[in-house]
Amino acid sequence: MGHERALARAGLGPVAGCDEAGRGACAGPLVAAAVILDDRRSGRIAGLADSKTLSAAKREALFNVIMDKALAVSWVRVEADECDRLGMQEADISGLRRAVVRLGVEPGYVLSDGFPVDGLTVPDLGMWKGDSVCACVAAASIVAKVARDRIMIAMDAEIPGYDFAVHKGYATALHQRRLKELGPSRQHRMSYANVRRAARLHSS
């Protein structure tokens, strides 16, 4: 939490970290999360790292610890049709901005993974590999990933046949086969070329 502590010492705390999950998927929502940690209140959370480097079981365990110990946590869904309408970059920024606003605690500074979050009323900084070097961004990465995985597992029951619980909406070989067999569902992002190809195949 070196970056967070430095900002707090400069009078810019509390510091929120934000990140998303599902940007590269061709189905399902993008989920954006924001987290404010407070190690003075509840101690440091061991094991925080980029969610992509952790097993599903480890992410779930850390999610529960984050929810218990963080000063504030929020996440929002940006649905597939909104991703199509806005484009992924703007959908990403919009989701992160909403997640920060919904924290319930106004941060003094916001750190994000990769690029800054335009439109905030507080200063912010996009950090290269922020989910690997900032504890609050890593925590947001884990929250976003776990929340989205749970959404995709539930979606698998609501829209059977696509195996959403397995591939989580990403364009794996299995998902591509299901798209070819069934065509797109209402949860697919029509702005993606592989989804449009499947739609054309099933409209001919």
From Swiss-Prot:
Protein EC: 3.1.26.4
Reactions catalysed according to its record: Endonucleolytic cleavage to 5'-phosphomonoester
Predominant cellular place of this UniProt entry's protein: cytoplasm
Gene Ontology CC, one term: ribonuclease H2 complex
Domain of life: Bacteria
GO biological process, one term: DNA replication, removal of RNA primer
Disulfide bonds, paired cysteine numbers: none
Coiled coil ranges: none
Subcellular location: Cytoplasm
Entry keywords, A to Z: Cytoplasm, Endonuclease, Hydrolase, Manganese, Metal-binding, Nuclease
InterPro entries hit by this protein: RNase_HII, RNase_HII/HIII, RNase_HII/HIII_dom, RNaseH-like_sf, RNaseH_sf
Cofactor: Mn(2+); Mg(2+)
CDD domains to which the protein is assigned, alphabetical: RNase_HII_bacteria_HII_like
Classification via SUPFAM superfamilies: Ribonuclease H-like
All copies of domain RNase H type-2, residue ranges: 13-204
Enzyme class: hydrolase
Keyword Cytoplasm: yes
tRNA processing found in the keyword field: no
One annotated GO molecular function: RNA binding
Cofactor binding description: Manganese or magnesium. Binds 1 divalent metal ion per monomer in the absence of substrate. May bind a second metal ion after substrate binding.
Positions annotated to bind a divalent metal cation: D19, E20, D113
Function of the protein: Endonuclease that specifically degrades the RNA of RNA-DNA hybrids.
Stated family: Belongs to the RNase HII family.
Name of protein: Ribonuclease HII
Organism from which the protein derives: Cutibacterium acnes (strain DSM 16379 / KPA171202)
